[in-house]
UniProtKB/Swiss-Prot annotation:
It catalyses: UDP-N-acetyl-alpha-D-muramoyl-L-alanine + D-glutamate + ATP = UDP-N-acetyl-alpha-D-muramoyl-L-alanyl-D-glutamate + ADP + phosphate + H(+). Coiled coil: none annotated. It comes from Desulfitobacterium hafniense (strain DSM 10664 / DCB-2). This is UDP-N-acetylmuramoylalanine--D-glutamate ligase. The gene is murD. One of its GO terms (molecular function) is UDP-N-acetylmuramoylalanine-D-glutamate ligase activity. It is an enzyme of class 6 (ligase).
Length: 454
């Protein structure tokens, strides 16, 4: 779709929205930007060079104020807002910023989604893809807006995009050459309402694929596996727990590919730097994706040996006085935090809490009871988590009023040979702007406690 001189409304003036405006201006569109925040609460607006008539700020607008042919939504904006619904009724197209950036780009596109593991998988695929020698862009829901970067990528390049359910629910014509669905567990139910709606949003990563494209699915996740018969693309399965008849699996200590009755060994688990069974999901999906790029087994294995992981995902902060500190601030739901608990054999002091996303903590607390030595709760969800802990029979837990107090309590509970793990099972939005800010503050507090230079 040629956007030159088309009227396009961008909703949300955060990172994605500002990137979308810049991209649209480069494409010759007539842009209107709206955000309910006041101008002094927003940064980067002035640099866009939009006249006042193309800025609608400080309130949720009526459709007649912002009428457009295309609406581009930032990830945090619900398409159910009345003015957006009125626009849809009037025939406006609704896109995500990712759709805007990628829909007409000829590069090879790899999309990664799932409840947990997206960022690690996306980053790992990007690292491996660069071994092809082609220009590679890693972006999406991972800190870099695609619209900011895509014009710098040549037509023969590779795009690896982390895609959230918010971005995927707005798929219009976006087609991924390789689409990956890692797993689906309850998350963002405050936005999607039901698990079925959430799964449907995730599954849209495959909606526009063709028979020549590839869909990579987790065999061990029944909800994901059952999508296979409904997909147009060629399906490749992986299983982090078993040897499949066809697909990527495990045999003893090795990750292998089973195909046409032949077993191909790829790499031994002990050669990997990433800990935890859940990381096998990320690794296997990454292997399957980059095989579509033509990488050899040795090139893949060498890349896997060198990959150390991603900041804020079970990141090693350091060992102080015999205590290992792990920053898993990206563990923003119970399933992610539960996987982190199973990654360590040492006794764990867990810091959990933050802002809940409408999720239940009872099953999570059953795992906490089995795996955790001491539990420290903090944040707006602390009372809810405390009740779930009581209901599960956990008697020893601590409540902190501030995040700094939570870290000090955890250190006091820990002994040499223990792990202090920040894996909150909640978002950061009650105390911090992002999980990154929370993770950085955790690292700062730990280093400050042990008087290490920051």
């Amino acid at each position: 779709m040629n956007l030159k001189k088309k009227k396009v409304l961008v909703v949300g003036a955060g990172r994605s929205g500002l990137a979308a405006v810049k991209r649209l201006k480069a494409l010759g569109a007539r842009v209107i930007l709206t955000d309910q925040k006041e101008p002094d609460q927003l940064s980067g607006i002035l640099e866009l060079g939009l006249p006042d008539g193309q800025l609608v700020l400080g309130h949720i607008p009526q459709w007649h104020e912002v009428e457009a042919e295309v609406i581009v939504l930032s990830p945090g904006v619900s398409p159910q807002l009345p003015f957006i619904q009125e626009g849809i009724a009037q025939g406006a197209l609704v896109w995500s910023e990712v759709e805007l950036a990628l829909r007409d780009h000829p590069a090879f596109k790899i999309g990664v989604t799932g409840t947990n593991g997206k960022t690690t998988t996306t980053t790992l695929i990007g690292e491996l893809a660069r071994r092809t020698g082609k220009s590679t862009l890693v972006a999406g829901n991972i800190g870099v807006a695609l619209s900011d970067q895509v014009e710098n990528l040549d037509e023969e390049g590779i795009i690896v995009a982390e895609l959230s359910s918010f971005q995927l629910e707005l798929v219009d014509s976006l087609c991924m050459n390789v689409g990956i669905l890692l797993n689906v567990t309850p998350d963002h139910l405050d936005r999607h309402g039901t698990l079925e709606n959430y799964l449907a949003a995730k599954a849209r990563i495959f909606e526009k694929q063709r028979p020549s494209d590839c869909a990579i699915l987790n065999w061990d996740d029944a909800r994901v596996r059952e999508l296979a018969p409904h997909l147009k693309a060629r399906v490749v399965f992986f299983s982090p727990t078993s040897l499949l008849a066809e697909g990527y699996g495990v045999q003893g200590d090795e990750i292998v590919l089973a195909r046409d009755g032949k077993i191909t060994p790829i790499i031994k688990r002990r050669e990997l730097q990433l800990r935890g069974n859940h990381n096998l999901e990320n690794i296997m999906a990454s292997i399957a994706a980059v095989r579509e790029l033509g990488l050899s087994w040795e090139e893949i294995a060498q890349g896997l040996r060198e990959f150390k992981g991603v900041e804020h995902r079970q990141e090693v902060v350091g060992t102080y006085e015999g205590i290992l500190f792990i920053n898993d601030s990206k563990g923003t739901n119970p399933d992610a935090a539960e996987k982190a608990l199973y990654a360590f054999e040492e006794p764990i002091v867990l810091i959990a809490g933050g802002k809940n996303k409408g999720l239940d903590f009872h099953d999570f607390m059953k795992t906490v009871k089995e795996q955790v030595k001491s539990l420290v709760l903090v944040g707006s969800a602390a009372a809810e988590m405390e009740q779930a802990a009581k209901d599960t029979g956990i008697r020893h837990y601590l409540r902190a009023e501030t995040f700094a107090e939570a870290v000090e309590l955890a250190i006091a509970e820990a002994e040499p040979g223990n792990v202090v793990l920040l894996s909150p099972a909640c978002t950061s939005w009650d105390m911090f702007k992002s999980y990154e800010e929370r993770g950085e503050f955790f690292k700062e507090l730990v280093r400050r406690h042990y008087r290490e230079p920051i």
